[in-house]
């Protein structure tokens, strides 16, 4: 299993389904600026402030989150597609 460092979180994105009508992809279909994901691993240390104080992670393994589609490092680990993101790129915890 990947062990993220610092303020990083490992997530598994939900499969994106293309919108279709009668089997055809709709014209103008664009990617959303956010994506749903499940938290797979969280850094044990969390983020450090400018004064050196440790801020523990706000999310836990298994939570469903909404991620801003920006600085995402997608990796394949043990035949599984995962992504490493900064906790700051998580904009909401779902459910």
Curated annotation (Swiss-Prot):
GO terms for biological process: chaperone cofactor-dependent protein refolding. InterPro entries: Chaperonin_GroES, Chaperonin_GroES_sf, Chaprnonin_Cpn10_CS, GroES-like_sf. It holds the Pfam family Cpn10. Disulfide bonds: none annotated. Transmembrane segments: none annotated. GO terms for molecular function: ATP binding; metal ion binding; protein folding chaperone; protein-folding chaperone binding; unfolded protein binding. Keywords: Chaperone, Cytoplasm. One of its GO terms (cellular component) is cytoplasm. SMART domains: Cpn10 (SM00883). It comes from the Bacteria. It is found in: Cytoplasm. Gene3D superfamilies: GroES chaperonin. Together with the chaperonin GroEL, plays an essential role in assisting protein folding. The GroEL-GroES system forms a nano-cage that allows encapsulation of the non-native substrate proteins and provides a physical environment optimized to promote and accelerate protein folding. GroES binds to the apical surface of the GroEL ring, thereby capping the opening of the GroEL channel. Belongs to the GroES chaperonin family. Heptamer of 7 subunits arranged in a ring. Interacts with the chaperonin GroEL. This is Co-chaperonin GroES. It comes from Streptococcus uberis (strain ATCC BAA-854 / 0140J).
């Amino acid at each position: 299993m990947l062990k993220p460092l610092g303020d990083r979180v490992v997530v598994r994105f939900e499969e994106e389904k293309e919108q279709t009508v009668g089997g055809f992809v709709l014209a103008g279909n664009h990617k959303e600026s956010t994506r749903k994901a499940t938290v797979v691993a969280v850094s044990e240390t969390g983020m450090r402030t400018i004064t050196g104080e440790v801020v523990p992670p706000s999310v836990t393994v298994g939570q469903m989150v909404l991620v801003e589609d920006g600085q995402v490092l997608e990796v394949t680990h043990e035949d599984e597609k995962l992504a490493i993101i900064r906790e700051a790129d998580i904009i909401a915890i779902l459910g």
